[in-house]
C-alpha cells in the first residue's frame, strides 16, 4: 500500500465524540437478499446486524452505532449516526478492502491491516463475523462454556498478544441463538459490542426455491 496518509486515532475519536449523542440509523438491505429464519447461525447464508460499539483505550473512550453486512462475498462495516452520517465505512469485496473515512478512501488487500494502519486501532475485523454470531474460529481456544455448551470465554491464540472474548449474554433472533453483549480485550484496548438486531438473510432465488419444496 503506497502513499497512505495517516489518519490519527485522535482525529477520528474527535469526529465520533462530536456526534455521540446521536443514535443508530437504518441501512438498506441489498435487494438480492431477503430475511429468513434459521435454527443455527451457521445456516445463515448471509446476515446483517445493528448495534452499538464502545471502544476504550489507555487514552480515549467513545461509543457509536455499528452496522455490519456479512455475505459469502462481501463484508461491509459502518459506524454511523442516526441522521445517516457515515463516520467510517470498511468494505471487503473480491479480496480488496476499501476504507472510507474523513472524506478519503484507502485500499489494501487486508481489511484488518488497513484499519490498523489508517486509524491506529487493532480491531479484529477478520474474526468478528464469527464472534458476533457466537462462534469460535479453528485457531480459537474455548476457555469456558455455559450449560448450553455456548462459549462464554475464548482466546484467539493466533494473535500475539491474544484477544480475549467474553460472551456476557445471549438472545434469540431470526430463530437462532446469538450473543447480545460481547466484550473483547487485548492489552489496553477494550471493545464492547451490543447487538440489538441480527437478521439472517438468503438470496431471493434460493429462498423462493426452498419455499416451493
UniProtKB/Swiss-Prot annotation:
Lineage summary: Bacteria, Pseudomonadati, Pseudomonadota, Gammaproteobacteria, Alteromonadales
Signal peptide segment: 1-24
InterPro entries: LolA/LolB/LppX, OM_lipoprot_LolB
UniProt topology in membrane: Lipid-anchor
Protein name (record): Outer-membrane lipoprotein LolB
GO cellular component: cell outer membrane
Any single Pfam family the record assigns to this protein: LolB
Lipidated residues (N-palmitoyl cysteine): 25
Organism: Shewanella woodyi (strain ATCC 51908 / MS32)
Function: Plays a critical role in the incorporation of lipoproteins in the outer membrane after they are released by the LolA protein.
Principal location: membrane
Subunit: Monomer.
SUPFAM superfamilies according to UniProt: Prokaryotic lipoproteins and lipoprotein localization factors (SSF89392)
Subcellular location: Cell outer membrane
GO biological process, one term: protein transport
Amino acid at each position: 500500500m503506497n502513499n497512505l496518509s495517516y489518519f490519527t486515532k485522535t482525529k477520528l475519536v474527535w469526529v465520533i465524540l462530536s456526534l455521540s449523542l446521536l443514535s443508530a440509523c437504518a441501512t438498506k438491505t441489498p435487494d438480492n437478499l431477503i430475511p429468513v429464519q434459521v435454527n443455527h447461525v451457521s445456516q445463515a447464508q448471509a446476515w446483517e446486524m445493528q448495534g452499538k460499539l464502545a471502544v476504550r483505550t489507555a487514552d480515549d473512550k467513545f461509543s457509536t452505532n455499528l452496522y455490519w453486512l456479512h455475505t459469502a462475498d462481501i463484508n461491509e462495516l459502518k459506524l454511523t449516526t442516526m441522521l445517516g452520517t457515515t463516520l467510517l465505512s470498511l468494505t471487503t469485496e473480491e479480496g480488496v478492502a476499501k476504507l472510507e473515512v474523513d472524506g478519503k478512501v484507502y485500499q489494501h488487500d487486508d481489511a484488518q491491516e488497513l484499519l490498523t494502519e489508517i486509524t491506529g486501532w487493532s480491531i479484529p475485523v477478520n474474526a468478528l463475523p464469527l464472534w458476533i454470531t457466537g462462534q469460535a474460529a479453528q485457531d480459537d481456544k474455548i476457555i469456558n462454556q455455559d450449560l448450553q455448551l455456548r462459549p462464554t470465554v475464548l482466546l484467539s491464540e493466533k494473535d500475539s498478544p491474544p484477544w480475549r472474548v467474553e460472551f456476557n449474554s445471549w438472545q434469540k433472533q431470526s430463530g437462532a441463538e446469538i450473543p447480545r453483549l460481547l466484550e473483547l480485550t487485548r492489552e489496553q484496548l477494550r471493545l464492547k459490542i451490543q447487538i440489538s438486531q441480527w437478521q439472517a438473510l438468503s438470496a431471493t432465488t434460493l429462498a423462493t426455491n426452498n419455499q416451493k419444496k
